[in-house]
Amino acid sequence: MFSPAIDNLVAQLTRLPGVGTRTAHRLAFHLLRAPRDEALELASALQEAKERVRFCVDCGNWTEEETCEICRDARRDRSVICVVEQPADVLSLELTHEYRGLYHVLGGALSPLDGVDPEDLRIDELFRRVESDGVVEVVLATNPNTTGEATASFLADRLRHRVRVTRLASGLPVGGDLEYADEVTLGRALSGRREV
């Protein structure tokens, strides 16, 4: 419809989650109207993040160091690990200011239909941390959808004889993602977590 360069930009923007064709066009036109320096700064920031940000060797959260800021924080409660699917979930929970333990990012959820099995996730790393780090509680904070519930059930079955296993309380919408829940809802869910 437009020039090949604009069509390509729109196509690339639609690859972002939640960005449809109409939004991609708006973003593309905004970037084209913006001063050249502004567009180049955005491109540079994206490139820098892709080059510098990696996964924490301990928990799997995003970091620029070998170990993330949360894992390095001596004030955190090291006896509790909150298990989440993605690094974005860590941010969502941190914004509640209700949780002071550590995290473990699985990198997804079990989904046999999609070919995601336990060995495809950071589950063995979680078991090693529980065994060696003096963990007394694991909070299962996977998404309240089919794959998240299946993952929580799988982990609970394998952990409940070793440590206390809790699940976030209800209040989170079934079928929703933690990333989109507000701080109050997440805070209540954390405070009201239950044994599994």
Where are these regions (language model features)?
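Extended interfacial segments that mediate partner engagement and assembly in macromolecular machines
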Residues: 24, 72-142
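Short functional micro-motifs and their immediate structural scaffolds
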Residues: 63-65, 76
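Short cysteine-rich clusters marking metal-coordination/redox-active sites
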Residues: 56-59, 68-71
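Short metal-coordination and nucleic-acid-contact micro-motifs, chiefly zinc-binding Cys/His arrays
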Residues: 49-52, 64
